[in-house]
A protein has these predicted regions:
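Conserved glycine-rich Rossmann-like NAD(P)H-binding loop of the short-chain dehydrogenase/reductase
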Residues: 29-45
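Alpha-helical segment proximal to the catalytic Tyr-Lys
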Residues: 129, 173-177, 238
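C-terminal helical subdomain
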Residues: 184-187, 207-236, 240, 247-249
Length: 253
């Protein structure tokens, strides 16, 4: 099944983790990929692996905290492929964890909001007009379980991700009758560089600590998030918009 044959798909944060897994999943279903990340070498390697497997992908370096780079990113995608059908605004940072609100560093707060929230907002500001120009599209934003449920010691990250949920719903309602669907995914702990930074790199202790957060008693896998992103972006979810889908092993029940 090729749900995305020749569809133009832009993915930010595509050099590793969930973004990388999602890029491969879209490629397997025939998408033409425009991959974005700060890390040029890793991002180029992902694009090359897709091309080596017979897919279509180009890499574009950009920093989601730099507004001019976001506009240039979308313009470059449209110039290269002729439009934009799907956007997965996945890029994000973790910032400061296990820090009480009064002690949260201001610099970390500012950077979290700049990348995780304002970056997504600016992406949509440029992606929506590009999609309208060709009759519509689908946007999936990366939120988090920290965007729908409170966790102590994460006020900056929570603010950024609750904000993503809010702007997702607002944009979805603004364009619901104009052919653009906007949804968000809210993963819990997924095997990734971010999980390594928060829980450490020892796999056994990480599985025990992070896995215990979830009723399913394990960490999620990037492919499990990618599957949901592709469904939301596909015509199978044609009547789904303004949703926040939890991928959490039961954590939010």
């Amino acid at each position: 099944m090729s749900r995305f044959q020749n569809k133009i798909v832009l993915i930010t944060g595509a050099s590793a983790g969930i973004g990388e897994a999602t890029a491969y999943a879209f490629a397997r279903e025939g998408a033409r990929l425009f991959l974005v990340a700060r890390r040029r070498e890793q991002g180029e390697a992902v694009a090359q692996r897709i091309r080596d497997a017979g897919g279509t992908a180009v890499f574009h370096p950009a920093d989601m905290s730099q507004r001019d780079q976001i506009g240039a990113m979308v313009a470059s995608c449209v110039a290269h492929y002729g439009g934009l059908d799907v956007a997965f605004n996945n890029a994000g940072i973790d910032g400061a964890f296990n820090v009480d609100t009064p002690d949260h560093p201001e610099e970390a707060w500012d950077q979290l909001l700049a990348v995780n929230l304002t970056g997504v907002w600016f992406c949509m500001r440029h992606q929506i007009p590009a999609m309208l120009a060709t009759g519509g599209g689908s946007i999936v934003n990366m939120a988090s379980m920290a965007g729908v449920k409170g966790f102590p010691g994460s006020s900056g990250y929570a603010a950024s991700k609750f904000g993503v949920v809010g702007i997702t719903k607002a944009a979805a309602l603004e364009y619901a009758d104009r052919g653009i669907r906007v949804n968000a995914v809210c993963p819990a702990v997924i095997r990734s560089d971010m999980a390594d930074r928060v829980f450490g790199t020892d796999e056994r202790s990480k599985e025990e600590e992070a896995g215990s957060w979830h009723p399913m008693n394990r960490i999620g896998e990037p492919d499990e998030v990618a599957d949901v992103v592709l469904w939301l972006a596909s015509d199978q979810a044609s009547f789904v918009t303004a949703e926040t889908i939890k991928i959490d092993g039961g954590l939010g029940a």
